[in-house]
Amino acid sequence: MSASSSTADLRNRILFTIFILAVYRFGTFVPLPGIDPAQLKIMMDGNQKGLLGMFNVFAGGAVSRMAIFALGIMPYISSSIIVQLLTGVSDYFKNLKAQGETGRAKITQITRYGTVALATLQGYGLSVGLESSADLVINPGASFKITTVTTIVAGTMFLMWLGEQITQRGIGNGISLIIFAGIVAEIPRALVTTFELGRTGAVSTFMILVLFVLLILTILFIVFMERALRKILINYPKRQMGNKMYGGESSHLPLKINQAGVIPAIFASALLLLPVTFSNFSFSNNETFLNLSSYFTQGQPLYMLLYASGIIFFTFFYTSITFNPTETADNLRKYGGFVPGIRPGESTALYIENILTKLTTIGALYLTLVCLMPEFLIANYPIPFYLGGTSILIVVVVAIDTVTQIQTRLMSSQYEQLIKKTKFGK
């Protein structure tokens, strides 16, 4: 493949990704049939805080507009969480994972079935909740429920398909980019609201400046932590083949501090959001539920405790299923590599695992700090929820990963062209 064709392929992938994200954004403005928009606005104006506010941000504002993508990609993420957990404890799923490409295809299919089931359940709960709100549904009844469930399930599955298309034919991880696009689309409204709070005197100008300084520092901190590596020195012995000596070189095994990326924050959020997707509507007039839901708002100890626990758990869990120290040690021994001062095999695996555990601990604390520190500000000042730490983390990490993929493809294209020039030069 020539440099020009490689560049054209990259350009086409980027344009394809932008097109798919534009289709997604269009879908967030297509309303569910049978909803009174005026009554919906009145209801949503009083339900923009807490977990429902976070869910609305992740869905790109589709919840506040009660669009066909109102559930966003969360049913798929929730299904993925369940399947990933089963992979760690179930022999059946462990065997599927060990079967390679065939097993992964089967796991993907099971995840899709789980997505349909969750979207159906949540769609039905949503339809019941909408009907319980006075004058919100124009013609309540079985017809509305069937239409809503069908539309919600179709919208969720279409959104999942869009994400898969981005991953296969575009740039970056499709599911992450859809969440990224939803958050970015809500940022302008958050900025306008923040400046309006300053203009009216609800928040001092000094506090707004402090907020933006903290925002910049948080972004820089995230970039630093995502780029940070712990390099393990790997040596290769010299080997004589004929009259020549080969090998004797050194390399490094790079381990990221945050091996799990943004997945723990997304999974922890999805776990908290799972019961909220319809309960805010279904029990909106229930006093017990209202008292219980008050504990799941910004700054509340129970909310932050559950969120922090979820982030820490999924950081360790996801790292354990994506990086296997024993497998890495076996591959090193197979190719003659060794860590200086450490015996090949089991000792090397234990050494790598020990380092990985320390790095994962730091990574879990870093993710928890970034996601929860802004919650203290949100709890004490009238700052829009869209500027929460989780939103910032997802935007920055997904942007870094996407730019890295683009750079990798460009470098690969340049390297291929250099090799061809070298061959022609000979």
Residue ranges and their predicted role:
Residues 1-97, 102-426:
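N-terminal cationic and glycine-rich segments that engage phosphates or anionic surfaces
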